[in-house]
Amino acid sequence: PTTGSVEATLEETYFNRTPDHFCSHQHTPNNPGADRAGAVLTKNTGYIVWNVFHDYADKGSYHLKELVLHMIDNLLGDDRSVKVNLPDRGIVTFTKQEDESRYIAHLLFAHTSKRGANIEVIEDIIPLCEIKLDARLPKAPKRVYKAECEDGKIVTTDLDYKFENGVASVDVGKVTMHAMVVFDI
């Protein structure tokens, strides 16, 4: 029994396959009624009872990624510092530069191609369009702009934003591999 919300269950098999216990299928059928909590959420904790990150790295099962994201989203609720609609290979880092009175969101996306066992290379730069960013800030920014490198020079573009309930919402537009969104406070 658990006091939290069960987000996923583990279903036990009738038996484990061994030379003595054989099943003609790759997996032995599940034993109805022999299930148990596999992922549990409480108000401030989340627990997954198996090595989900190893399993995801090994097998790449989409449902494992979705389970982890679901649990993180539920734990963070409205308290997340940043949210962006980058695709799954996208990376966002959100930093505070106190001396400059600003926050910076670095948006990064590169489509990689696998070459060999453990090598991923970037061969094509694919721009992303209609990128949207929400950033939690202590107060409304004085200015929001995108900073990008073009031909070795930093180019800035002012961005319109909406500030409600401590969150600045920005339509970043196009991102080609990397862009910085700067929030001057």
Label every PLM stretch briefly:
Residues P1-K174, A179-V181, I185:
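A conserved amphipathic helix/loop scaffold
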